[in-house]
């Protein structure tokens, strides 16, 4: 459950139920990608990751791409932090939309996002309709707060923001 009025629930999904992390830990997910259908969820949030740790293998996972496309087709909020914007771009949902991504590595990811059809910005957070993209790890909390605002309302998101000192 998410703090505030406790009306939001957070669920995790992965290619498998046990997902190894870049730093040697394992995340036990609630669902596999095949089990996720947008009809049962209000929003989608995607964390970024490191290319050198095979983060982008999900870009070749048909079930993962289906999930993104389903949420986009239903105009449901989608949040992507850091390099997760690249995964959104690979589905085509960022074509002619404003978006941002990780700005380090001499703009490598910004350039890739542009080649995927996005209108690239260098803002910390970019909102284009129901899609929220964040520029890097430091954008994670502001992106999450915006996603909460879109799903459970401004007042609750503001209350959570205040509790967290933002």
Where are these regions (language model features)?
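Catalytic, metal-anchored helix/loop core of enzyme active sites in primary metabolism
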Residues: 82
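Extended, subdomain-level signal for the structured scaffold at the beginning of enzyme domains
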Residues: 1-78, 86-90, 112-122, 131-166
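Cytochrome P450 catalytic-domain "roof"
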Residues: 127
